[in-house]
Amino acid sequence: MRKKLIGLSIATALGIMSLTACKSQPAENASTNGAADTTAQAEGTKEEGTSKEASGDRVKLEIWDWWGDGQYKYVIEQLCQNFNESQDTYEVVHVNYPWGDVWTKALAATAAGNPPDVIIQDIRTVTHRAEAKQATDLTDLIAKEGDGFTDQFYPQLMDAMMYDGHAYGLPYVTDTRILYYDKDAFAEAGLDPEAPPETWAQLVEYARKLDVKKDNGSYERLGFFPGTLEWNAWAFTADGKDYTDADGNVYVNTPEKVKMFENIYNDFYQYYGKKELDSFSAEFGNGMTNPFVAGKVAMWVNTPTEFTKVRDYAPDKNYGVALLPALEEGGEQYSWGGGFSVEIPYGAKDTEGSWEFVKFITSKESQIYWASEVYDTVANIEASQDPSLMDIPVFKMALEAMPTTVVTQDRLTAPGASDIVLPYLDEIILGNKTPQEALDEAQASVEQLVQDSK
């Protein structure tokens, strides 16, 4: 019988979000999907938003998240207000806690029988909450909406909502990774500014031409630096496979993943030297010191929302966006993403009311509003494709990337697998182990984890 890991959903989510920071920081003046802005709040302090309190006979509902300031707070509270004005039965109030703390408090509140009514959660750990009875089974509510209700969401995101054939949330936002490239730098290097690399071999070829050295031999600009994408993410983009699946199969040392890390090590860390790359990347930061904004790298991998850094700090930069390069000629151009789900905690006092709000904020109209204001890639397919968003090139590229974006999950069959693999990947970058050696050892460790989790 599988070991019960009741508290793992919170601990795993916090570890995972350091990987995904699911995600990005959409704008300097916005509350981020990570911890940066919200941790300024006093730890453990509950802040209710400005949306109206329950009045008259309305049932008061609370949505919990970490969006405590900036554009994120404004938009979620506007959605609460829009919902409140759309009907006269429920009144939704926005409540935020600091990043991470919100999940710890929700877990405690759920265990105490007084959970929030709706909560924004990590998309990768839905199954943990489902197994631990921390999330409400939405299957019957979804069935009442008629056939095809869940078809409005990207399938890999809806798949992350499922546990034992039942749905325990709806996907809210996601992301993907794309390649940003400096068109002017391409032209200066004799490269076609309208032809970004489509394979790893092209990426390396272009990177060499885009490198610029100073008189002292150090680098003024690198054509490409792989360290702006997490090592685990590079593994997922190699073959489009997570480390494990729901059946406990393990895909750590696949030939494609081995090849990817041979490329990363040989073409960059061995070629330039780890010391040189570490010294060069030590100057990377945010804002004006963002490596792509500052012209320190000519090609850069990040989320679509990161275009706001270029917009705000280098408005005249002539750049393009493209899919991540395929590992081999003719291969898929895979990407990697995470995201957030919207869930009704187990034991919520008015499931029907909570469900009405969940439907409202995942609807096409609400998701278009969210995307247009904070630039997240939303889970609703029609909303993500809306013509009103297509003036922003990164939205078009995100749409193109989504079909081959791997949305990884922290599987119950191998909880924390990514954390186990990561040190082995570090050994590759340090030059202590070959990719084959390191990934073979990581494969064995994750296989043991699967056995231990039964």
What are these regions (language model features)?
Residues 48, 53, 98, 123-178, ...:
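Hinge/lid segment of periplasmic solute-binding proteins
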Residues 52, 187-188, 193, 212, ...:
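Conserved C-terminal helix/tail region of periplasmic/extracytoplasmic solute-binding proteins
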Residues 164-172, 177, 187, 201-259, ...:
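Extracytoplasmic/periplasmic solute-binding protein
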